[in-house]
């Protein structure tokens, strides 16, 4: 699911027509604000050969300037019919420079991204500063992750696990056009960490592209969520033994790797899409939840350990 598939046009941008018609404003300032087709060549009809401004008619359309049935003003003393329209006040010249053809059909499929000034990210320190600016110091999330009184812990963990899956799936979906096998041939977080995927049990994990890794991860998570023996959907269902260690921790450990890849390799795109607040809030929620129930070890955070510690201390 990809975000922001809207089409935008830069201020002052003109677009070419694809339907064989284009408005002409070359003579608009000289024709009292009237707009004529490109084939029109307005001229003055002079009566009795006298070039008198008082007797000059400023015609609006091409067909009104030509004689009707071969007759003109001097033939048999008759004048050809002339169609006139009320005069309009001419708009300021600066408003006549660019014309937008609303019949244009866009052929591109990429959104117009307007990067914000000063948002180039090169180091983890830059990411930390942006996170600090987009997150407040209120302890709302700190209280939100705590187990409510009387709530089953396994149920609480299962609900949040599915919630984090949906959040990460949505966040990654927003940058899929920037993350491809060509741009991200390996699932890495900086050059120091690479995450491998094992397609079958008993076989060693192999290196895959970032999109392939995320695709396999999301399918693997969905298969577990659909397994009634692991995530019972009925109230009478029970969770398996070792649910936290065998199910929850492996899922969250692997979901975290998507956060790491986005932060280390696609944070500029997140800034261009103006999703940094959404990403930082989701990531902080994830870290606080993992800390509250001791679900991840420091080694699991890899290159984002410093950022995780910063979020925990806020």
UniProtKB/Swiss-Prot annotation:
Query: Which stretches are tagged as biased composition: Low complexity?
Result: 44-55
Q: Which residues bind Zn(2+)?
A: 179, 184, 261, 266
Q: Which UniProt keywords apply?
A: Cell cycle, Cell division, Centromere, Chromosome, Cytoplasm, Cytoskeleton, Metal-binding, Nucleus, Phosphoprotein, Zinc
Compositional bias ranges of the Polar residues kind: 29-43
UniProt GO cellular component terms? cellular bud neck; chromosome, centromeric region; cytoplasm; mitotic spindle pole body; nuclear periphery; nucleus; serine/threonine protein kinase complex; Sid2-Mob1 complex
Q: What GO annotations for molecular function exist for this entry?
A: kinase regulator activity; metal ion binding; protein kinase activator activity
Renumbered residue ranges of the record's region Disordered? 29-55
SUPFAM superfamilies to which the protein is assigned, alphabetical? Mob1/phocein
- Look up the domain of life of the source: Eukaryota
Question: Where located?
Answer: Cytoplasm; Nucleus; Cytoplasm, Cytoskeleton, Microtubule organizing center, Spindle pole body; Bud neck
Q: Which InterPro entries match?
A: MOB_kinase_act_fam, MOB_kinase_act_sf
Q: Which residues carry this modification: Phosphoserine?
A: 34, 36, 80, 229
Chain segments annotated as coiled-coil in the UniProt record: none
Record note on modification: Phosphorylated by CDC15.
Protein's GO biological process = cell division; exit from mitosis; mitotic cytokinesis; regulation of cytokinesis; regulation of exit from mitosis; signal transduction
Question: Entry's Gene3D superfamilies?
Answer: MOB kinase activator
Concerning its family, UniProt says: Belongs to the MOB1/phocein family.
What's this chain's function? Functions as an activator subunit for the DBF2 protein kinase. Binds to DBF2, which is required for the phosphorylation and activation of DBF2 by the upstream kinase CDC15 in late anaphase. DBF2-MOB1 is part of the mitotic exit network (MEN) signaling cascade, which regulates release from the nucleus and activity of phosphatase CDC14. Required for inactivation of mitotic cyclin-dependent kinase for exit from mitosis, cytokinesis and G1 gene transcription.
Q: How does it assemble?
A: Interacts with protein kinase DBF2 to form the MEN DBF2-MOB1 kinase complex.
Other comments? Present with 5020 molecules/cell in log phase SD medium.
Task: State the protein's name.
Answer: DBF2 kinase activator protein MOB1
Species assigned in the record: Saccharomyces cerevisiae (strain ATCC 204508 / S288c)
**GN (gene name):** MOB1
